[in-house]
Amino acid sequence: ITTTLMGEVLKQAGHNVEYVQADYIAQFAGLETGDLHVAMELWETTAREAMDASFATGNVVSMGETGMMAIEEWWYPAYMADRCPGLPNWEALKDCPEAFATPETAPLGRYLGGPVTWGGFDDERVEALELDFEVVHAGTDAALFAELEAAYQRQDPIILWVYSPHWAPAKFEGSFVEFPPYSAECYNDPSVGINPDAAYDCGKPTGPIWKAAWSGLSEKWPDAAKVIENFKISNADAAGMVAEVDLNGKSIEDTVAAWMETNKGCLLYTSDAAD
């Protein structure tokens, strides 16, 4: 959605745009060779290492933040707050794991993590923070949020991995758990953090969602580069568009067009040159 929105803004500024699908990490190789020109949604939480490696080649440059902030963390519906007093402070989970238990995990609480391929170190986090929870991984992104939807409708116990921007925190009332703040040292040095004997005794990293481009972009299309650098969108606006597509069945193109019509005054671009 962010890519389409950026593309449509560029079109309004008089530029020709071609959309190319690329693997999340493999796209950096395309940017380095100049086969791809812009990547619009690089999460600090998952792409930092790949970004740094590409920037080091000199062939890829940062185009700044998108305005969105990446959040990936344990999340619980608002109705669970009464069942586990003290939330969103993580220490409340030490006192009420049974509030999140299921017949399969009792007496342990059940935490629904993302697919194993997402990483996230939730098993390590549970052990390091001495939480009486069992980590269960959803098979897919769709399965993760389908389970949330079903639990929310029945007011069933659930705590799970949610990320933002996404439609889930826009649709469902709830909160992210507040763990001890993330630091690289917390992940790498057991002596750092509240548990001196274990790493991962803190929350997941958060940070900006970035734009990146082939280093030759600003010379070949200077006006387009300015448009891309100026582009900003909020988590709320992005999540709203994701909800329109995923929940209401609208096409990405129609959703982007509607947002642009409503937010004409927010679009920053110049049109003194076109490609």
Regions found by a protein language model. Give the residues of each.
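Short, polar/charged alpha-helical segment
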Residues: 1-16, 126
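Ligand-binding pocket segment of bilobal, Venus flytrap-like solute-binding proteins
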Residues: 36-40, 110-188
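A bilobed periplasmic-binding-protein/Venus flytrap-type ligand-binding module shared by bacterial periplasmic
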Residues: 72-83, 207-220, 241-244
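C-terminal capping/gating helix-and-loop segments adjacent to ligand/active sites or protein-protein/ligand interfaces
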Residues: 225, 229-259
